Amino acid sequence: MSCYDLCRPCGPTPLANSCNEPCVRQCQDSRVVIQPSPVVVTLPGPILSSFPQNTAVGSSTSAAVGSILSEEGVPISCGGFGISGLGSRFSGRRCLPC
């Protein structure tokens, strides 16, 4: 029986020619010989990036709050990290209440 034979109908031939039983055929094995050739694969190095975020949320008095939340013109974030991201410059600071 050929590997490409279709499933035979189960019982009387239906109008749609469908079958409720699985159709499985075992074909002969195929053999493929692959000769390895020298291949150089270059994987790109990792790209490291960070996006520090300093956010001040305020109202119509945000200009006054902005002057409180900065030191020497550099914004201070509540997490203790300055805009430089080093973390040690403003680590002892606390956020002021609004």
From Swiss-Prot:
Keywords: Acetylation, Keratin. GO terms for cellular component: intermediate filament. Belongs to the avian keratin family. It comes from the Eukaryota. One of its GO terms (molecular function) is structural constituent of cytoskeleton. The lineage of its organism: Eukaryota, Metazoa, Chordata, Craniata, Vertebrata. InterPro entries: Keratin (IPR003461). This is Feather keratin 2. The modification N-acetylserine is found at S2. The avian keratins (F-ker, S-ker, C-ker and B-ker) are a complex mixture of very similar polypeptides. The keyword Mitochondrion does not apply.
